[in-house]
């Protein structure tokens, strides 16, 4: 049917756009803007600090400019990684949900950092993107914890929140992790400038290492 062909073409174009961006040799991370009233703009120093850490410590070629991009915009296909945070409500229109789905199916990646309070809004919002998927807790043996820096016990605990253990959840599409969600952890706060939260240096470094 025409809608199925259109969706297939959209996914193909998304994959091509991401591959073209990656072939240029300079990656760029963006902060994803969403509707619903939640503070998508929280932690303004977080992602720039992560980018600087990756470039300085790992020699990665990430563009230091971190733009904000609307979830419903075709511009999201320019960025291989989108970062999301906030404390409050998240809503996606049908067009926004389809756009984000095509982005993720086409090769994009979404990181969500629980800035304390986002959980009850994030889960139903992502259900509009992937109705067929549920967030699953990733085991400590998952490769996400064993990249450039090793985290044998999973996510580091950065902020207290409810005093619960930090957990990493994922949405897995056809065997590929398309969304990683840090819960009761707050990596984003850990990436921020020291004078924002006054986190101990070891917490700041652990958060950056996990992000990298």
Language model: regions and residue ranges:
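Bacterial N-terminal signal peptides
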Residues: 7-20
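Alpha-helical scaffolding within the catalytic cores
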Residues: 64-71, 93-99, 163-167
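Aromatic-Pro/Gly-enriched surface loop or interdomain linker
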Residues: 21-81, 85-88, 186-187, 193-212
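An acidic, glycine-rich "communication" segment
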Residues: 36-37, 45, 119-211
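Active-site-proximal beta-strand/loop segments in catalytic clefts of secreted hydrolases
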Residues: 32-35, 72, 84-87, 106, ...
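Loop/turn elements at helix/coil->beta-strand transitions in domains of secreted/extracellular proteins
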Residues: 25-27, 77-82, 105-110, 133, ...
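Short, Lys/Arg-enriched N-terminal segments with co-localized hydrophobic residues
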Residues: 1-3
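Short alpha-beta junction capping motif
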Residues: 29, 81-121
């Amino acid at each position: 049917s025409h809608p199925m062909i259109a969706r297939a073409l959209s996914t193909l174009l998304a994959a091509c756009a991401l591959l073209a961006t990656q072939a240029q040799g300079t990656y760029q991370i963006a902060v994803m803007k969403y509707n619903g009233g939640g503070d998508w703009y929280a932690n303004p120093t977080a992602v720039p600090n992560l980018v600087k850490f990756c470039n300085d410590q790992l020699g990665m070629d990430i563009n230091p400019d971190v733009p904000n991009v609307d979830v419903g915009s075709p511009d999201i296909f320019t960025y291989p990684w989108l970062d999301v945070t906030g404390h409050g409500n998240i809503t996606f229109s049908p067009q926004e949900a389809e756009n984000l789905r095509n982005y993720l199916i086409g090769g994009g990646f979404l990181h969500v950092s629980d800035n304390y309070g986002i959980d009850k809004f994030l889960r139903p919002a992502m259900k509009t993107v992937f109705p067929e998927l549920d967030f699953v807790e990733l085991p400590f043996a998952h490769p996400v914890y064993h990249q450039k820096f090793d985290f044998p016990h999973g996510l580091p605990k950065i902020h207290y929140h409810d005093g619960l253990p930090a957990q990493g959840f994922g949405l897995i599409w056809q065997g590929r992790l398309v969304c990683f969600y840090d819960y009761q952890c707050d990596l984003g706060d850990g990436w921020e400038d020291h004078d924002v939260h006054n986190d101990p240096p070891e917490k700041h470094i652990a958060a950056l290492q996990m992000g990298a």
